[in-house]
Amino acid sequence: MKRHDKITRNLFNKIHLKQIKTPGYKRVVNLLSEKNLNLPKDFFKDKICADLGCGSTGAGALNLLNLGAKEVHLMDMHKHIFKPIKQNLKKHDGKFKIHVGSLEKLPFKNNFFDFVLCQGVIHHMDDDKKGFKEIHRVLKKGGKTHIVVQGNGGLIPKIMYNVIIPQYKKNPLVKKLLNEIMDNKIYKYKRFFNLNLNKKGVKLVKFLSRYFDEDFRLTMKDRVLSPNYYQYEEKKLIKNLNKLGLKKTYRIKKKVQFNNIRALVAPMYYEYDHLISRVLYGDGDIAILSTKTK
């Protein structure tokens, strides 16, 4: 049987390469700053960093290099990451190294990194505990890690993971409709909307095409097609990290800019503790920063 993380890597290669051409790419290469991580100015200067599960574009590594990192090591599971990453990071040539490996067994020495970035990776793993342990192993004492995982609860995730995805897998009509939306074939339904809503139908199709843009469709593919999307309880996650020696953990507030329908949920990334956020999004996207204390 094929491992889930390898299936995910092959899927994401296609998604990431398409993402480069969307406004969403500008968003993901500017997610981090010393300010939103609550770190001192010029924190990354002279730091040796890692972008684990870097994807096919190396967006996180580019973000770190732009912040002044001395050196960034990128790692993912397949050598097809080399060509696009070298192209995307060429202005930082000589300051990054690319590795093929797995979070379950990182190809790095103990106590090697000052800072480890791991965004949206561990919740896809077959053995997430190994991933957390390996991050702890390769961090220097006093080093910091920024980890992002999918949180638990909320009406939106429940609808996605308990209704939409199961129906996608077992109902061929649902699968066909979602595939056509994800493949930007919404205009096939122009006649349907036009017959039922006349001119309003045409406007609706234009609205859907604008706000269900390529960036959003790639996000849908991420959620719907990924074979494994583990969800974490925030308090339990922090408790388990503490046991490993990853302490002083705090959650990061992110001001995220979307140009599509996801703009409606953007406030939930920042005001994650708001009543509306908790009801609709539960623990949300859990973005934390921890320090290795032992």
Per-region residue spans from a language model:
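A short glycine-rich, Lys/Arg-flanked "PGG" loop and its adjoining helix->strand segment in the class I
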Residues: 129-141
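Conserved class I S-adenosyl-L-methionine
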Residues: 47-55, 145-202
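Acceptor-substrate binding/catalytic loop of class I
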Residues: 153, 220-236
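Conserved alpha-helix/loop element of class I SAM-dependent methyltransferases that forms part
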Residues: 24-46, 63
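Class I SAM-dependent methyltransferase SAM/SAH-binding core
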Residues: 57-105
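A short acidic, Gly/Pro-enriched loop at the edge of an enzyme's catalytic core
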Residues: 104-115
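N-terminal, positively charged/glycine-rich alpha-helical extensions of SAM-dependent methyltransferases
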Residues: 1-22
